[in-house]
Amino acid sequence: MSIADLKSRLIKASTSKMTAEL
């Protein structure tokens, strides 16, 4: 696993979290 992969995963997770809170 690369750092870029982890970063994209984190961004996806935070984005879905924000969308769910709306």
UniProtKB/Swiss-Prot annotation:
Keywords in alphabetical order: ATP-binding, DNA damage, DNA recombination, DNA repair, DNA replication, Nucleotide-binding
Family: Belongs to the RecA family.
Top-level division of the source organism's lineage: Viruses
Any GO MF annotation of the entry: ATP binding
Role this protein plays: Important in genetic recombination, DNA repair, and replication. Possesses pairing and strand-transfer activity. Interacts with dda and gene 32 proteins.
Signal peptide as annotated in the record: none
A GO biological-process term: DNA recombination
Record's protein name: Recombination and repair protein
